[in-house]
C-alpha cells in the first residue's frame, strides 16, 4: 500500500510560513554578533535553525560556543514567536492606509515635496546624495528647521538631531532659514486665521536653534559610539522627529582600510537607523557623497559606498545639475515612482526653481 502521508493543515502551514520569515535581528544578541549573522546572510530564523553550530560558526566568523547559543535562541523564538506573529499580522489595506497617513517633513520646495509624496516621510531611512555644492547640507539644515513647524501650521512640532561628520553645519545659515520659517508661519497664520493676530505664532528663531541637537563627530569610532547611544538619547527626548547625518560616508572613506569590515559596520549602522525610524516614528536622512566608478569603459559619478550600501536605505534621492539648475531625482523607493524636480537654494532656504535661478557659488 502506498502511503501519501497526512497533508499539513492550513494552520500548521501558516505557522511554518510565519516562523520562516521571523527576522534574525529580533534575537537578543550583541550588535557585533547580530551584524556578523546578517553579513553572512542569516537574516531569518529559519535559515539559522537549519544549520549546524559548526557551519554557523564558520560562516559568521564566530566561536562554536556562540553559534550554539544562537541556535538555542533561534529554536526558542521559532517555537514561542510564531503564534504572536500570526496574531499580529496586518492586512494590505491597513498597510496602505498607514503608508498614506505617515507624517512627512516639508522641504519648503513644493515641487520637491510633490515627487516625495508630501515631503520626507517618517519611519523611513532616506539617503540624499550628490556632488559638492549641490545643496545637501542646505537640505539637511532646512529639514532640521521645518520639522519644528507646529501642528497647527501643518508641521510635526518636533525636534532635530544633526550629526555633522564634515564640519559643514553653519549655525548662521541655520539662523537665516529659521528666521524665514518664522516669517512664513506668521504669514500662514494670518492668512488661514484672519480673526487671529498674525503674531500669535510664538516660536522665535532662537527657539528653533535650541531645538536642534548638534553633534560634531571627528572619527568613525565616535560615529559608531554616537549611533549606539542614539536610542537612549531619543528615549529621553521623545520630541525628536528627524535624525540627519551629514555625511554618513566621510570618515569611512577617509580612515577605513578594511573594506569587508567597513561593509559590516555600515550595515549594522543602517539597521540601527531603521530600528530608530520605526520605533520612534521619525525620519532618518543620510547625506552621502559621490565617487567615481568605472563602468562600460569610462568613469562615471556614483554615490559613495557602492551597490551593497544602496540596499540599506528605504528611499534614495540623487541631486544633480542640469545646466544652471539643481534637480532632485527619486532613484529608489518602494512606494514612490521615479521622478525628478528642480529646486533652488536661496537666502531663505530651499524654494521652487524659477526661470531666473542660476548656479550660485554660495556653498
UniProtKB/Swiss-Prot annotation:
InterPro entries linked: DNA_recomb/repair_Rad51_C, DNA_recomb/repair_RecA-like, DNA_repair_Rad51/TF_NusA_a-hlx, HR_Repair_Mediator, P-loop_NTPase, RecA_ATP-bd
Tissue expression from the record: Detected in various tissues. More expressed in reproductive tissues than in vegetative tissues, with the highest level in young flower buds.
Positions of ATP binding: 130-137
GO biological process: DNA recombination; DNA repair
Classification via Pfam families: Rad51
Subcellular location: Nucleus
Domain of life: Eukaryota
Predominant cellular place of this UniProt entry's protein: nucleus
SUPFAM superfamilies noted in UniProt: P-loop containing nucleoside triphosphate hydrolases (SSF52540), Rad51 N-terminal domain-like (SSF47794)
GO terms of molecular function: ATP binding; ATP-dependent DNA damage sensor activity; DNA binding
Function text: Involved in the homologous recombination repair (HRR) pathway of double-stranded DNA breaks arising during DNA replication or induced by DNA-damaging agents.
UniProt record similarity statement: Belongs to the RecA family. RAD51 subfamily.
Subunit and interaction comment: Homodimer. Interacts with XRCC3.
Name of protein: DNA repair protein RAD51 homolog 3
High-level lineage: Eukaryota, Viridiplantae, Streptophyta, Embryophyta, Tracheophyta
